[in-house]
Amino acid sequence: MSDDKKSDDYRVDMPSSRTSRAPSPIMRPALKSAPSLTENPMAAVLAYCASSILMTVTNKYVLSGVDFNLNFFLLCVQSVVCVTAISICKAAGLITYRDFNTDEAKKWFPISLLLIGMIYTGTWALKYLSIPVYTIFKNLTIILIAYGEVLWFGGSVTPMTLFSFGLMVLSSIIAAWADIQHALNSFGQQSEAANEALSTMHAGYLWMAFNCVCSATYLLSMRKRIKLTNFKDYDTMYYNNLLTIPILLVASILVEDWSSANIQKNFPPEQRNTVIMVMVISGMSTVFISYTSAWAVRVTSSTTYSMVGALNKLPIAISGLVFFDAPVTFGSVSAIFVGFVSGIVYAVAKVRQNSKPKTVLPTTNIPLSASSRSMQDSLKA
């Protein structure tokens, strides 16, 4: 473009008495198109919270059956549903992930074993404990992961993070105390029903301790292995679920009772279709959690995502009070509140820690993939 042409662009011609100019067209501002639903941060956050609640409630519904004991079979059904769902999505061109590779499967197989340990112990803990207590105690996994990062990845724990850990421990103590007091007040101090309720709770706490250790080990190991395999979101989901199917199926056949009498107990005729449908929905919810987690990470900031992870504990705990008639006492509500505050304090502490300028190599805050985040959040439920 020449200089004369540029000057013409900024020149204003004065109208001549001998000539007339046509009126200039009225310039209207361009209308902005409304943002699509997939770019809406609020929709992503609500979908993420809803999928977390859906998975917790459906699992609790199946596991809270009086005689349900086919936990390996439940996990196998969930894995089959998940692999089927993402395979259909890949065939439809909605998502992409790597094709099965034997060498990659061998590298990832130990992670799948740890995943089985984490989910299996979690099912027994969720069976014996109420959803609010389970959610509160799940916070203790964060403490183990934090100190695991200190040992394995050279991480650090700030004073504010340490304060949030103290609140997490306090909320767990309050929840256990409230649970025990409710059992004693409901059934009497020395009654057989009270002793049975206490033994059930103690079994739940023991399974919860195993679950916290397994969860921390799984997540730390997966973080290390993802760096070696360079897996993306759906790669991790695909291999995690595909490799666990044969293990869970064999474990169910060898360990669990498949007699006709036990099948009748696990799937009573009047509830059989409902239980099977809920098992399938719980498998689909794992896909929903992974997708909505990745969606929330994409359309929100890391700060918002961290805060959503903390705030998500409250509706999950409340869902246990609403859907499963968990005891609503001063102690249980206080435990939920303290656990909720501890999550917020922890999220703020991590945001502040990550916002500090890094003067050394970034070995302390290597981000997890969205799939590992979604798996960790779904099991905090």
UniProtKB/Swiss-Prot annotation:
GO biological process: GDP-mannose transmembrane transport
Cytoplasmic compartment residues: 1-36, 89-107, 154-161, 221-242, 296-303, 349-381
Lumenal membrane side: 58-67, 127-130, 185-199, 264-274, 325-327
Chief localization: Golgi
SUPFAM superfamilies per record: Multidrug resistance efflux transporter EmrE (SSF103481)
Annotated transmembrane regions: 37-57, 68-88, 108-126, 131-153, 162-184, 200-220, 243-263, 275-295, 304-324, 328-348
GO MF terms held by the record: antiporter activity; GDP-mannose transmembrane transporter activity
Protein name: GDP-mannose transporter
Organism placement in taxonomy: Eukaryota, Fungi, Dikarya, Ascomycota, Pezizomycotina
Primary gene name: VRG4
